[in-house]
C-alpha cells in the first residue's frame, strides 16, 4: 500500500469517528471525555460510568450513528491507576461505515460497570469473559458467572498480579 | 359436551364421533429432562458441552458451556515477545492457521513503520486462500459426517491432503505453520511451488463440483438442513456474527472487500451471498452454500495472485523484519477475514517493551457460538447437530 | 500374522499358545476412543481418513468409551477437562491402553510454563502406555505409536501385570539401526 494512500485512508477513518463522537458529545456533554484522535484506534472514554448503558443505547439507535455491530469488548488492567476497565470496538456495519472505540473504567476492588448485554448481544459473553479474567462486576448482566475457567477457580488470571493456585481438586497445577 | 370438554385436562382431547359417542385422546405425560451433550461427543466438533433442556425430542433450550480447551492464550501473549506469539496464534484456530497468523501480523504491523515487500503480500494471500479452502473442506467434511454421510468426509480429507503437502513444502509443517511473520514471511516459495499450486487449482475445480453433486444437491442433506437454525440478518449483526455465518443470513459483508487489507483491493472476486433459490436465507443450508461457493472464489483468487506475483530473483522474505520488534506506543484493533469470520486482535503496546501489554484475541467462533441458545429453541435433537455443524466451530478459538 | 508357535498338522490343527492368540486378536482390532481435544485431533482424523488409512490396521474409531480398548488422548487436557478424562478412562473396560498423542498431553506442550489452566501432561491423572511426541505428530508418527501399542500387546501374558509387560517391551525393543547396519555390511561383503 502506498504510504500517502495509507495515511489518507487512515485520516478519513479518524475524521468519520470524530464526526460520530461530536454527536455523542453534543448529547452527553461531560459524561464523555475528549476525543483521542490517534491514527490506529480513535477512542473516547466514558467519565460518568453510570450513564454507560444509556450512551450505548443512544449509539446503537440514533439514526446518524447506528453503531449496530460490536466487534470486541476487551477487559483491561491498569495497575498503575489501580483500575480495571473495558475497551469496546464498535462499528456501523454496512450503514454509515464509521467505527469508534469506547473505554470505561472502574475500581480494582469491587468495581462495577453497567452491562450493555441488552444493547449488543455480543457483549453478553464478552462481559462474562472479562469478569472471569479480571473480576470486575457488570451490573444488570443477565447471567454473570465464569465462562472459561471452572466455576470454583481461584483468582482472576489476567490481572498483572495473578498467582497460579497450587492445586485444583487434588491435581497439581504448575509444571 | 361442553361441560365434558371443560372438565378434562388440557392434555386430553375429546373428539365427538357423532351419535353421542366420543373419542378421548390423552397425550403421554412428559416432563423436562436435562441432557448433556459433550464435552466428549462425536459431533460437537471438539470439547463443547451443551446442556439441553428437552421435552421429549424437542429441545427447549441448549446452553453451551465452554472453557474445556482454555489454554491461556492471552496470558502467554503478555509474557512472550511479539514474534513468539505467532505459534500460539496458530494453535488457536488450528484449521486456519495461516489466516490467524495473517490477522495477527496485520494488527501488529499497524503499530510498526514497516513496508511489506510486494512479493510477500502475494505469498501471504496465496497461502491464506489455500488454507481457507482447506478449512472449508474440513467444515464441510465434518458437517457431512455429523449428519451421517461418510463419503464426503473422505473426499474432503483427500483433497485437503494436497493442500497440506503444498503448505508443508512452503513452510515445513503440515498444520501449524509459523510461516507468516511480523514484517514478512519465514521462507520464500520453493522453486516449482507456483506450478504445483496452479496444478492443484485445476485439479480441485472439478472436485468442488463433484462435492456439490454428492452433498449439496443431495436430497437427504437438503431435507436435514433447509429451514433449520434460521437467523434474521439484524439479529445476526447484533450478536456480532461475521464471515460465512453473516453472509448466510443475507448480509453482504466481507472484510476482504469492505475493510480491505494487504493486496485484496487488487483482486477481483465477489462476496458470496446465497440467492434464496436452493435454501431459505438464514438457515443452515445457506451457511453451507456460502462455504461451498467461497472455496471456488478462493481458487480464482489464487490464480490471479499467481499471475500478478513478482518473480523471486534471490528475494529474501525476512528482509523487512527488524531484529527486535518494538512497536510504538499505542493501541490497535486489527482484524482479518478468517474462514470462520472476523478474527480481531486488540493489542496495546507501551512503546518500550518487546512484549505486548495486552493482546486480546476476538475470536469469530466465540461470538458465533453465543447465539446457540437462541438458535436451538424449539429444534429437535438431530437438528441441534445440524446447527452446530453449520456454525463450524473450532474450540481452540472459542476457548483460546 | 504373528502366530509364532503355530504348527499346522495334516488335520488343520493349529498349535499355539493362548496368549499369542489373545494378543493377536487384540492387537489386530484395536478400537480407539479417539479422544480428540485440539489440533492433534485433526491429525488423528487425517490419519483415519483416506491418505493414511488406519482402518487397514483394524483400527476403527469408536465414540463410546464402553466399546473401545484404546484411548488416544489427542490434544491439550485442561483442568476443567481433567475430571472428565478420568471418568472416561474409568468407563473403559479392561484391557485398556492409553496413547498420549502430542506434546500437550505428554507434558503440557507449549503451554507448560504460563498455562495456568493446562494440565501438564495427562499422565498426572491416568496411566499412559505410549507417548507420541510432536506438535502435532505427523500421521506416520501416530501410526508408529499405534504399532508400539501393538508391540506392547504382544508382550502381554495372562497373569502378568501391565507394568511387567511394559518392562518386557523395553527390554525387547531394539534400535532398528543396528539391524539395518548389519544388513548393509552383509550386502557389502557379498
From Swiss-Prot, chain B:
It catalyses: a quinone + NADH + 5 H(+)(in) = a quinol + NAD(+) + 4 H(+)(out). It is a peripheral membrane protein. Keywords: Cell inner membrane, Cell membrane, Membrane, NAD, Quinone, Translocase, Transport. InterPro entries: NADH_Q_OxRdtase_suD, NDH1_su_D/H, NiFe-Hase_large. The keyword DNA-binding does not apply. Pfam families: Complex1_49kDa. It is found in: Cell inner membrane. Its EC number is 7.1.1.-. GO terms for cellular component: plasma membrane. Gene3D superfamilies: Cytochrome-c3 Hydrogenase, chain B (1.10.645.10). GO terms for molecular function: NAD binding; NADH:ubiquinone reductase (non-electrogenic) activity; quinone binding. Its main location: membrane. NDH-1 is composed of 14 different subunits. Subunits NuoB, C, D, E, F, and G constitute the peripheral sector of the complex. NDH-1 shuttles electrons from NADH, via FMN and iron-sulfur (Fe-S) centers, to quinones in the respiratory chain. The immediate electron acceptor for the enzyme in this species is believed to be menaquinone. Couples the redox reaction to proton translocation (for every two electrons transferred, four hydrogen ions are translocated across the cytoplasmic membrane), and thus conserves the redox energy in a proton gradient. Belongs to the complex I 49 kDa subunit family. PANTHER family: NADH DEHYDROGENASE [UBIQUINONE] IRON-SULFUR PROTEIN 2, MITOCHONDRIAL, NADH-UBIQUINONE OXIDOREDUCTASE 49 KDA SUBUNIT. This is NADH-quinone oxidoreductase subunit D. The gene is nuoD.
From Swiss-Prot, chain C:
Gene3D superfamilies: 3.40.50.12280. Keywords: 4Fe-4S, Cell inner membrane, Cell membrane, Iron, Iron-sulfur, Membrane, Metal-binding, NAD, Quinone, Translocase, Transport. [4Fe-4S] cluster binds at residues 39-40, 104, 135. GO terms for biological process: aerobic respiration; electron transport coupled proton transport. Belongs to the complex I 20 kDa subunit family. NDH-1 shuttles electrons from NADH, via FMN and iron-sulfur (Fe-S) centers, to quinones in the respiratory chain. The immediate electron acceptor for the enzyme in this species is believed to be a menaquinone. Couples the redox reaction to proton translocation (for every two electrons transferred, four hydrogen ions are translocated across the cytoplasmic membrane), and thus conserves the redox energy in a proton gradient. This is NADH-quinone oxidoreductase subunit B. It comes from Prosthecochloris aestuarii (strain DSM 271 / SK 413). The gene is nuoB.
Amino acid at each position: 500500500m502506498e504510504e500517502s494512500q495509507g495515511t489518507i485512508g487512515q485520516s478519513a477513518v479518524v475524521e468519520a469517528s470524530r464526526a460520530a463522537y461530536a454527536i455523542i458529545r453534543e448529547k452527553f456533554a461531560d459524561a464523555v471525555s475528549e476525543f483521542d484522535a490517534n491514527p490506529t484506534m480513535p477512542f473516547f472514554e466514558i467519565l460518568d460510568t453510570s450513564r454507560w448503558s444509556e450512551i450505548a443505547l443512544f449509539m446503537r439507535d440514533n439514526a446518524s450513528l447506528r453503531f449496530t455491530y460490536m466487534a470486541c469488548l476487551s477487559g483491561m488492567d491498569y495497575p498503575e491507576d489501580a483500575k480495571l476497565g473495558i475497551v469496546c470496538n464498535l462499528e456501523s456495519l454496512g450503514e454509515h461505515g464509521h467505527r469508534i472505540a469506547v473505554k470505561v473504567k472502574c475500581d480494582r476492588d469491587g468495581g462495577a460497570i453497567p452491562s450493555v448485554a441488552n444493547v449488543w448481544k455480543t457483549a453478553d459473553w464478552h462481559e462474562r469473559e472479562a469478569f472471569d479474567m479480571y473480576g470486575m462486576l457488570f451490573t444488570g448482566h443477565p447471567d454473570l458467572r465464569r465462562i472459561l475457567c471452572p466455576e470454583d477457580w481461584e483468582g482472576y488470571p489476567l490481572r498483572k498480579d495473578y498467582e497460579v493456585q497450587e492445586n485444583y481438586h487434588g491435581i497439581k497445577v504448575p509444571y | 359436551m361442553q361441560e365434558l370438554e371443560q372438565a378434562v385436562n388440557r392434555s386430553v382431547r375429546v373428539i365427538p364421533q357423532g351419535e353421542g359417542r366420543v373419542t378421548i385422546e390423552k397425550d403421554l405425560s412428559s416432563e423436562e429432562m436435562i441432557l448433556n451433550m459433550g464435552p466428549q461427543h462425536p459431533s460437537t466438533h471438539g470439547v463443547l458441552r451443551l446442556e439441553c433442556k428437552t421435552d421429549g425430542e424437542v429441545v427447549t433450550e441448549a446452553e453451551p458451556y465452554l472453557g474445556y480447551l482454555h489454554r491461556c492464550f492471552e496470558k502467554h501473549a503478555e509474557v512472550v515477545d511479539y514474534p513468539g506469539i505467532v505459534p500460539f496464534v496458530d494453535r488457536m484456530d488450528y484449521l486456519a492457521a495461516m489466516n490467524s497468523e495473517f490477522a495477527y501480523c496485520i494488527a501488529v504491523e499497524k503499530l510498526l513503520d514497516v513496508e511489506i515487500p510486494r512479493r510477500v503480500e502475494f505469498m501471504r494471500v496465496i497461502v491464506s486462500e489455500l488454507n481457507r479452502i482447506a478449512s472449508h473442506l474440513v467444515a464441510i467434511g465434518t458437517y457431512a459426517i455429523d449428519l451421517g454421510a461418510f463419503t464426503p468426509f473422505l473426499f474432503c480429507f483427500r483433497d485437503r491432503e494436497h493442500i497440506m503437502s503444498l503448505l508443508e513444502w512452503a513452510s515445513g509443517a503440515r498444520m501449524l505453520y509459523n510461516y507468516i511473520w511480523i514484517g514478512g514471511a519465514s521462507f520464500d516459495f520453493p522453486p516449482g511451488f507456483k506450478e504445483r499450486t496452479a496444478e492443484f487449482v485445476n485439479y480441485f475445480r472439478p472436485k468442488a463440483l463433484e462435492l456439490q453433486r454428492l452433498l449439496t444437491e443431495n436430497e437427504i442433506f437438503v431435507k436435514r438442513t433447509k429451514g433449520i437454525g434460521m437467523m434474521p440478518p439484524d439479529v445476526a449483526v447484533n450478536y456480532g456474527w461475521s464471515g460465512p455465518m453473516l453472509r448466510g443470513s443475507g448480509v453482504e459483508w466481507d472484510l476482504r472487500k469492505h475493510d480491505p487489507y494487504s493486496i485484496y483491493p487488487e483482486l477481483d472476486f465477489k462476496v458470496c451471498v446465497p440467492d434464496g433459490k436452493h435454501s431459505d436465507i438464514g438457515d443452515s443450508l445457506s451457511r453451507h452454500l456460502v462455504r461451498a461457493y467461497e472455496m471456488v472464489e478462493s481458487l480464482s483468487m489464487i490464480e490471479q495472485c499467481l499471475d500478478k506475483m513478482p518473480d523471486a530473483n534471490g528475494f529474501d522474505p525476512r528482509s523487512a523484519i527488524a531484529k527486535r520488534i518494538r512497536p510504538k506506543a499505542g493501541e490497535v484493533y486489527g482484524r482479518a477475514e478468517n474462514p470462520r469470520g472476523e478474527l480481531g486482535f486488540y493489542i496495546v503496546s507501551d512503546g518500550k517493551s518487546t512484549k505486548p501489554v495486552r493482546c486480546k484475541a476476538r475470536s469469530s467462533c466465540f461470538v458465533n457460538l453465543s447465539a446457540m441458545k437462541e438458535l436451538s429453541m424449539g429444534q429437535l435433537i438431530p437438528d441441534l447437530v445440524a446447527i452446530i455443524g453449520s456454525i463450524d466451530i473450532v474450540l481452540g478459538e472459542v476457548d483460546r | 500374522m504373528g502366530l509364532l508357535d503355530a504348527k499346522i498338522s495334516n488335520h488343520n490343527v493349529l498349535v499355539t499358545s493362548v496368549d499369542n492368540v489373545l494378543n493377536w486378536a487384540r492387537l489386530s482390532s484395536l478400537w480407539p476412543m479417539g479422544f480428540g481435544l485440539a489440533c492433534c485431533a485433526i491429525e488423528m482424523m487425517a490419519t483415519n481418513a483416506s491418505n493414511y488409512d488406519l482402518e487397514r490396521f483394524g483400527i476403527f474409531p469408536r465414540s463410546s468409551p464402553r466399546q473401545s480398548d484404546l484411548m488416544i488422548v489427542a490434544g491439550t487436557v485442561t483442568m476443567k477437562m481433567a475430571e472428565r478424562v478420568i471418568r472416561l478412562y474409568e468407563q473403559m473396560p479392561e484391557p485398556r491402553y492409553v496413547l498420549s498423542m502430542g506434546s500437550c498431553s505428554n507434558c503440557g506442550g507449549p503451554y507448560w510454563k504460563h498455562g495456568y489452566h493446562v494440565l501438564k501432561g495427562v499422565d498426572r491423572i491416568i496411566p499412559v502406555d505410549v507417548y507420541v511426541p510432536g506438535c502435532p505428530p505427523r500421521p506416520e508418527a501416530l501410526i508408529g505409536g499405534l504399532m508400539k501399542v501393538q508391540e506392547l500387546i504382544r508382550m502381554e501374558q495372562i497373569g502378568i501385570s501391565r507394568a511387567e509387560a511394559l518392562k518386557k517391551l523395553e527390554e525387547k525393543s531394539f534400535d532398528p539401526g543396528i539391524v539395518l547396519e548389519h544388513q548393509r555390511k552383509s550386502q557389502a561383503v557379498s
